[in-house]
Amino acid sequence: MAEQVRKERPPVFLGKKRAYQGTGRRKTAVARIFLIEGNGQISINERPLDDYFTEIKDRNAVVGPLELCEMRNRLDVRVTVQGGGITGQAGAISQGIARALKGMFGLAEAAGQAPAEGADGEPGVVPMAKRLRDSGYLTRDGRMKERKKYGRKGARKAFQFSKR
């Protein structure tokens, strides 16, 4: 069987600024991400991050990939997210940001704009894509809600059984 090779998406232009796209999924939530050079503003469905996510763990999940790559204050993030609940949406956004960052660093390293980390043989320096993958931001969490079965109360729970 032939191996499928995924090509990195080229940047899109929003106005005069270059933007990098990423898509993330978690449970039934789907997030579409645009990373634009800026000063660190994050807007989700045209609302600020602090207004959209009230839980600190959800905010940290969204900001995690940016802080790992040390790009928190250098990129603006525009997000459109649909479906799922709040935590599922946070996971989808996190994966989408990581994928967009991977595309951004992958294209920059391939073009020679930013030298590939670890290219000069420095021990302990890891490329961004590998760093994101090792941290788990690029991995799709495939856990979904299990369907309800007939003859049962839920997916696993059975109706009460009486022997006599």
Which residues make up each language-model segment?
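Structured, basic alpha/beta domains of bacterial-type, RNA-associated proteins
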Residues: 2-25, 31-82, 87, 91, ...
